[in-house]
Amino acid sequence: MVARRTFGFTLIEIVIVIALLAILSTALWSNFISAINKGKDSRRKQDLKTIVEALELYYNDEAVYPLELIWGDSLVNPDDASLVYLSKIPNDPLPNRSYCYDRSAEDTFSLYANLENPNDTDRLDPPQACGGEGEYNYVLKSSNQP
């Protein structure tokens, strides 16, 4: 009688391979999500820096900061609409979130955002409240504010 040789994988080999693939994909997925969150946080920080620069230019011309900011609108000189400080005030990359602008006096302001990366070194702990709009864990302040 001739011995019959079979080819293929046993059930245990298939289960082990599937388990290893599941572990690897979980690790890669969490790294992917972490990288996306860090990218959004980087954009938030850059957005706030851009807004601060525009607000400082506004203050240099008007000697006060604007009362409010409307996200998505432009920041223009109230006396001369052709003088544009910022063509579009950026908003948070997530549609259900918003930045917060708090002008505590004519010559000071704070801009707030919520960072997603819990390990970010710029993250405030504990978070700070802003204008009754919730708590934020990242802030930039006017240049004349400590």
Residue ranges of model-derived segments:
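Detector for intrinsically disordered, low-structure N-terminal pre-sequences
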Residues: M1-V2, L75, Y138
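Aliphatic-rich helix starts adjacent to a transmembrane/signal segment
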Residues: W29-K49
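N-terminal single-pass transmembrane signal-anchor helix
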Residues: V2-F32
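Extracellular/periplasmic head regions of type IV pilus-like filament subunits
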Residues: E56-N117
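Short, surface-exposed interaction loops/tails
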Residues: E106-P146
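A generic fold-level signal
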Residues: T6, R43, R103-E106
